[in-house]
Structure formats: C-alpha cells, structure tokens
C-alpha cells in the first residue's frame, strides 16, 4: 500500500459466489471513474479459489469496465486484515492508514457515501 501514499485506496474483497458482491460491483465500477474523486485507487480482490476465466466472466456479466481483477485466493491479505466475510471494503487514507471498514454490500454511488468519502479525498 505504501506505493499508493497520497491516494485514497479502497480494497474491496469479493467472490464470484457472493450475491451481495454481485449487487455492489457495478457501483464500485462507477466509483472508479467518478470525476469528483481524484487520487482514488480501487482494488477489487477476489478471495475465492476461482480461475481467471470465471472472474472475468463475472465482470463481463456485470459489464464491469473500469476495474481490474486482483486475487487473494490463499487469503493472505484477508487474514492480515482480519476479514470476516465478503463483501468487505477497507478504506485507507492518503497516509496509508485504515480509516473505515464496511462489512456487507453498499451502494458506492449513494450521495451520502460520496459526500462522506470526499472528505478523505
């Protein structure tokens, strides 16, 4: 994460079998290109044991165009961050410090969420 100091960093942990992950992924994709948020890095991290093809199909089915796929299929990062399930979103400020953790699905396009997030951007 230190490579991204100066940026707001969002780690979103998900899996292809997770219905709430499927619900929130399109709004996370839109957040990536939100013109009101600069210096924003988003890493959607698949914690399942899926192959790349299954993950790509998940993104294709949801028309995800702005995000890359990352993997933590041996759950190293998930364990380091003491994750309890998916979806979980962990937010880091520009100094690389965790400032929020969202457990469960949210709408990343929600006006109140965007207003709150802009305070850290």
Annotate the PLM regions.
Residues 2-3, 29, 115-121:
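Proteins that catalyze or organize thiol-disulfide redox chemistry
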Residues 1-9:
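A short beta-strand-turn-helix
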Residues 22-62, 73-79:
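Structural microenvironment flanking redox-active thiols in thiol-disulfide oxidoreductases
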Residues 60-65, 72-118:
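Thiol/disulfide oxidoreductase modules built on the thioredoxin-like
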Residues 12, 44-46, 101-103:
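Soluble periplasmic/extracytoplasmic beta-strand elements of cell-envelope proteins
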Residues 5, 13-30:
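Conserved redox-active cysteine motifs that mediate thiol-disulfide chemistry
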Residues 40, 67-68:
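Short, conserved active-site loop motifs that form the nucleotide-linked donor/cofactor pocket
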């Amino acid at each position: 994460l230190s490579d991204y100091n100066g940026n707001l960093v969002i780690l979103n942990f998900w899996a292809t079998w997770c219905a709430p992950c499927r619900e929130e992924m399109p709004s996370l994709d839109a957040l990536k290109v939100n013109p009101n948020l600069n210096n924003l890095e988003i890493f959607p991290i698949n914690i399942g044991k899926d192959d790349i093809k299954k993950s790509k199909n998940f993104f294709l089915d949801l028309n995800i165009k702005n995000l890359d796929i990352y993997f933590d299929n041996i759950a190293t990062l998930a364990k380091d961050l003491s994750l309890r399930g998916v979806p979980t979103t962990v937010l880091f400020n520009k100094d690389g410090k965790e400032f929020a953790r969202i457990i469960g699905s949210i709408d990343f396009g929600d006006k109140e969420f965007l207003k709150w997030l802009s305070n850290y951007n």
